[in-house]
Amino acid sequence: MLLAHLPELGSTRLIKSRNPAEALQKLNETLTENVRRLVVIGGDGSLHLAANHVLKNGYTKQVALGLIPAGTGSDYARILRLSGDPLQALHQICTAVPRKVDVLRITDGNGEVRYAINTFSTGVSGWVSRRLAGLAVKGSAVYLRTTLKAFISFEAVDCRVVVDNTPWFEGPLYLLAITKGSHFGQGMHISPRASLDNGLCEVVAVEPMSRWRLPLRLGRLYLGNHLSASYVHYRQGRTVVIEPITNNPGFEIDGESTDAASVTVETVPAALTMLA
């Protein structure tokens, strides 16, 4: 049904892919100087892939990105207040006034650069992403089971965090999230004060917690009323440097697992044009 309505976008070419490598190959073949809009039908991972291609290949002044949520994780769609109904989301894209949004530029110790449209995090979220990356079958139920297992068995990681050239936190962490959007992890309201276009990133650190306190504190994280809690550290900034102290905890970028010894995260203002 959705395919029948795609001509509402104007002259349209549909790209289908079975994996990220094929998607990138087809984007290379398809994106030309004549393309003005790139609409992703998928989740946060698919949008992450498309946004990185646009950012790394110099299409940011030419191409506006749209999203029709259809993937396992759709936190960015929630942030943009896009409808979960594909036809409604398509209508929103067709009638939207393009808006500029910030992104996060992530540089690892080897100088490799990637971009996050929403979130870069470590701790329990990195643990979850590592395990999901190795699973052949994915979906909301698998994500929920993996997350619950993580909250029960995960051990805190030691990190040193510097924000805007000032030491901010050092010690054990359960979760460290650096975000542009308000939600991640399939609905966790981790950064309730976030803005997509203020030139700042949100930095939220959650200290380790006992198992018996976990349900209540986890509930606060999902509801978004945790920033004043004693076990949470919060601030805004433009540049964040993360240095694991004891071991490599594993990181995630927009839900995609990655490894690095140390990481620098920088806010890039007005980097992308979104249709929402």
Where are these regions (language model features)?
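Catalytic core of DAGKc-family lipid kinases
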Residues: M1-A4, I15-S17, K56-Y174
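Short, solvent-exposed amphipathic alpha-helical segments in soluble enzyme
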Residues: M1-A4, L55-K56, A133-G134, P192-S195, ...
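ATP/NTP phosphate-donor binding region
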Residues: M1-I41, H48, N52-H53, N57, ...
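Glycine-rich beta-strand-to-loop/alpha-helix junction loops that act as flexible
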Residues: I41-G43, I68-A70, K180
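Short amphipathic alpha-helical segments
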Residues: A51-V54, R78-L80, H189-I190
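Glycine-rich phosphate/pyrophosphate-binding beta-alpha loops
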Residues: S121, S125, A177-S191, S257
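Short acidic/glycine-rich loop or secondary-structure boundary segments that cap or lie
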Residues: S125-V128, F169-G171, H183-G187, R211-L214
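ATP/nucleoside-binding phosphotransfer catalytic cores, i.e., glycine-rich phosphate-binding loops
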Residues: V163-N165, E170, S195-L196, C201, ...
